Amino acid sequence: MMDMGGMAHAMPQGPSRPETLLYLIAPKNPKPLPLPKALSPFPTLPAPVVTRRLVLTEDMMAARFFINGQVFDHRRVDLKGQAQTVEVWEVENQGDMDHPFHLHVHPFQVLSVGGRPFPYRAWKDVVTLKAGEVARLLVPLREKGRTVFHCHIVEHEDRGMMGVLEVG
């Protein structure tokens, strides 16, 4: 049996018994839902009060991942912002791998990726940066409190590519 990271003891041995968990019954010719004729207008945001730079790097030999040269420490606040303000975050991937950058609590707009304007305005919580790319994000800080930002690849996050944002 393959080593499954400690899970082997909890898994049944022998042939599996498939079980039906759900029956889904749908009409043969479903009616399409109507789409709105126009999208909701996008709110006008105040001018950004600060531009921050976050640099994503990695040390593959040590299997460590960094933001601004540091691995995650839950006791450290990496960024401090003010509620009801808007910031620009420039997130640069100096590593050799793609990194999907994720921010909790505060949806953002992608202004550009790789120097090219983003093709449409939308609220996002993840933007993927290929090796060498820079993403410019417009980040409204609406809620007070602590939250995190990190690479959305769990192995990268667990090995250090995460930081703490505190909004006061």
Region locations from a protein language model:
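Short, hydrophobic/aromatic beta-strand segments
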Residues: 99-103
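Extended terminal and domain-junction accessory segments
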Residues: 1-98, 140-146, 150-168
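Extracytoplasmic beta-sandwich strand-turn segments characteristic of Greek-key/jelly-roll folds
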Residues: 48, 68-81, 105-144
